[in-house]
Amino acid sequence: MENCTVFWFRRDLRIDDNAGLYHALTSGNKVLPLFIFDTEIIQKLPKKDARIEMIHAALRNITDAMERNRCNVGMYLGQPRAVFESLLKKFNINKVVTNHDYEPYATARDKAVGEFLQNNGVAFETYKDHVIFEKSEVVKDNGTPYKVYTPYSRKWLKRFSEKSLSHYPSEAHLDQLATVVQPQLSLNDLGFEPSHVPQPQYTFNPTIIKEYEESRNFPALDKTSRAGAHLRFGTLSVRKLVAYSAQEENPTFLK
C-alpha cells in the first residue's frame, strides 16, 4: 500500500465538521481511519456500560457513511502504543492525525504515542476540535487563568463576539479514504454487553434555547437539548451547536 495518513478517532465521532479528519483528508495521502478501545480505560468499566455502547454505535454509523467509498473505521483493542506498533508493520504510515484530548491520562498517552511515532519517522499532528476556546485562549488581562466562573464566562462571551467560527468540511473529502477493509469488533469482542439504556437524541429547538434561562432549573420539564453526551463523544460538532445557538442570542445557553 502507498504512503497513508492515519486518522485516529477519539472524542470526535463524526465525519462532518471534524477538524482533524479534515486536515488528514486534505494531506495529500489516502487516509486510514481507526478507533482504539484503550484497555487502560475500558477494563475498569462495567460490562453493561452505556458509554461504550454509544461509542460503538457511533463508529458503526461512521462506517455506514464511509462504505460508499469502500472504507470502514478500523476498531482495535489494546494499548494505543502497541496498536500503532503493530500498524506500522502492516501499512506505510507517514503521519498520524487526531484531535486534542485534554484529560490528564489522555495528555500523557498522547505524549508517549507521539514520541514513539516520531522515533519511527512518523509525524504526529493534533488539532483543536472539541472546544471553542482552549484554556490559554480565555485568560485574565495579565495572562493568568480565571478561578471564578462568572468573570471567565464574561471574557468567553466577549472573545466569542469577536471570533468567527471555523468550519471544516471533512464530509466533502471522503474520496480520500483508503480502500482498505479493517477489523470490526462487536460489543462482545470488547468484553461488553448491551446496556439497554436508550441513547439520548439531541434536538436543535429554538424554543428550548430561548427559554433556557427560565426552564433550566426545572429538570422535570422536557426543556433541554440532550446534547451533553453527544458533545462528550463528539457525535455533534460543538461549532455547529454554538453557531446555531448564537442565532437565538441567549448567552445563558452558551454558558
Regions found by a protein language model. Give the residues of each.
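Trp/Phe/Arg-rich N-terminal binding region typifying the photolyase-homology
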Residues: 1-160
